[in-house]
């Protein structure tokens, strides 16, 4: 009997036809997708030009998230002309082609990846493609998911299938003792640093080990969300009872007898004991501390007690040049301590760290404290439902009492394309996924960290150790 990895099992179950003799090129069935107002317009134009319909409208969800304002007093449509056009076009596409669209004002609106999970649209064993690289996040629930381009969105809409190039298998086993205040964000930043920005190119990464099993589902979502930052096309974690409990009762999760049958099948979704991986890595997180990025790529990070590395110590000329460029852009020096670096802004949000657990941990840090003078901070819940739940728990009051702005759901400051934008020279500690040059505004400097670390920096006025009250 042939042994298989979890990734291979799911892809094989969705394979309609092998298109190459080696089985790498395939035609696969895609279970579901989500579209936003920014990456989907051309796909719908192609459908119209070719007189085609969306093959399975119920498998498609549209949500407004990239270009909408997060302002507390936002209106149904953005005030910026191009953004307004994009939103109206998505709504029209939903109406014309028969799929649900969540716009501002809808109680279910939110960031696409947050909404897909909270509504139970993502289930173990599914194969999902969507027009955003962080689609890989769904692997936290035991699904294979990956980002696709506009032409693939069009092909999926018309056929519910895609031409797919099978990935190699990589297993990352995470072991060791998890220290106090070490979050999933710290763990994934450490993994990305260890593996490098291109360390998982061409692979689906399966995360496993005692540390992974110990993570909550929402922590696993953070982990899988950022696997793409070391170039993994997809990432996955075998579903367990935590996942089943998390999904039960959600809007699109199976009900009644179908739920029992689904769980029975989901329990089979794991790599066989003798399954062969193309690449295996073990990472020990014993001694890991809360971490922060210092450069302009997520792999350029260090623990809070470390100093910024010296490019001269790097043997690879390309990496050395990348470090030098990053230090110049960030206005930092080799050997400088990351701890104590002054900030101007703090942000919590994005598909990486905007769920209810993220807001709770940040609120615990902020309780009874005030923003440091000169620091501006705002929090953007990942969905309108997350926002409502947080308000029911009184979390919004803690943020507001501390001086933070409590805003509406959207991608917001994860990327500077929606009115939430910082200025040249601003330095922001951010619970997002990317710290590229200009990501939050022209010449803005971004430091990635966990929500708890962001909260602590906001009241100190500088990057600080959350373990030190």
Name what the model sees in each region.
Residues 1-469:
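Fe-S-dependent hydro-lyases/dehydratases of central metabolism
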């Amino acid at each position: 009997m042939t042994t298989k990895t979890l990734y291979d099992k799911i892809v094989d179950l969705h394979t309609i036809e092998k298109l190459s003799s080696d089985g790498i090129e395939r035609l696969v069935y895609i279970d579901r997708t989500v579209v936003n107002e920014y990456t989907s317009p051309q796909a719908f134009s192609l459908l119209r030009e070719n007189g085609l319909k969306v093959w399975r409208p119920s498998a498609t969800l549209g949500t407004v998230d990239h270009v909408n304002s997060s302002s507390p007093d936002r209106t149904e449509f953005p005030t910026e002309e191009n953004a307004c056009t994009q939103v109206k076009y998505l709504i029209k596409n939903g109406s014309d082609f028969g799929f649900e669209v969540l716009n501002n004002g809808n109680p279910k609106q939110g960031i696409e990846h947050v909404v897909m999970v909270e509504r139970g649209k993502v289930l173990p064993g599914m194969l999902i493609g969507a027009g955003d690289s962080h689609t890989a996040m769904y692997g936290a629930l035991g699904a294979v998911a990956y980002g696709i381009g506009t032409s693939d969105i069009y092909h999926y809409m018309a056929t519910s299938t895609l031409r797919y190039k099978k990935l190699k298998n990589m297993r990352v086993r995470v072991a060791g003792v998890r220290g106090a205040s070490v979050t999933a964000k710290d763990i994934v930043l450490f993994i990305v640093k260890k593996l490098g920005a291109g360390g998982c190119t061409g692979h689906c990464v399966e995360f496993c080990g005692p540390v992974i099993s110990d993570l909550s589902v929402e922590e696993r979502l953070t982990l899988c969300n950022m696997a793409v930052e070391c170039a993994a096309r997809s990432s996955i974690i075998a579903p367990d009872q935590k996942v089943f409990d998390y999904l039960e009762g959600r809007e699109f999760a199976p009900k009644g007898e179908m739920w029992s049958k689904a769980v029975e099948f989901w329990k089979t979704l794991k790599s066989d004991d003798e399954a062969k991986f193309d690449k295996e890595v073990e990472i020990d997180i014993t001694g890991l501390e809360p971490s922060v990025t210092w450069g302009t790529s997520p792999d350029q990070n260090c623990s809070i007690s470390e100093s910024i590395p010296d490019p001269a110590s790097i043997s690879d000329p390309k990496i050395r040049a990348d470090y030098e460029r990053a230090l110049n852009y960030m206005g930092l020096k080799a050997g400088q301590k990351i701890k104590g670096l002054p900030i101007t802004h703090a942000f919590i949000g994005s598909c990486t760290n905007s769920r209810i657990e993220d807001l709770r941990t940040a609120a615990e840090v902020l309780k009874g404290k005030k923003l440091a003078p000169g620091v501006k901070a705002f929090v953007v819940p990942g969905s309108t439902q997350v926002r409502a739940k947080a308000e029911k728990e009184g979390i919004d009051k803690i943020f507001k009492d501390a001086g933070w702005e409590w805003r509406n759901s959207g991608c917001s400051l994860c990327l500077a394309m929606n009115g939430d934008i910082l200025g040249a020279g601003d330095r922001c500690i951010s619970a997002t996924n990317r710290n590229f040059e200009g990501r939050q505004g022209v010449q803005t400097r971004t430091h990635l960290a966990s929500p708890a670390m962001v909260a602590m920096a906001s009241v100190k006025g500088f990057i600080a150790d959350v373990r030190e009250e």
